[in-house]
Amino acid sequence: MQVEETLLKKKQTINANNILSFNRVAVAPYSYIALTPYGQKI
C-alpha cells in the first residue's frame, strides 16, 4: 500500500514537472520576442 502511494506521488510530481517545462517551452518564444527591439515595436 505504501509503495503504491509513493509511486503515485512520484507520478504526480513528474506530471507537474512536465507541465511546468511545457509552459516554459511554450512561453519562451513569446518572452524572447518581447525582449527584442523588434518585439518592443509591436
Swiss-Prot record:
Keyword list (alphabetical) reads:
Chloroplast, Plastid
What's any one GO cellular component for it?
chloroplast
Location of the protein in the cell = Plastid, Chloroplast
Q: Where is this chain primarily localised?
A: plastid
The protein in question is named Uncharacterized 4.8 kDa protein in secA 3'region
Species, as recorded: Diacronema lutheri
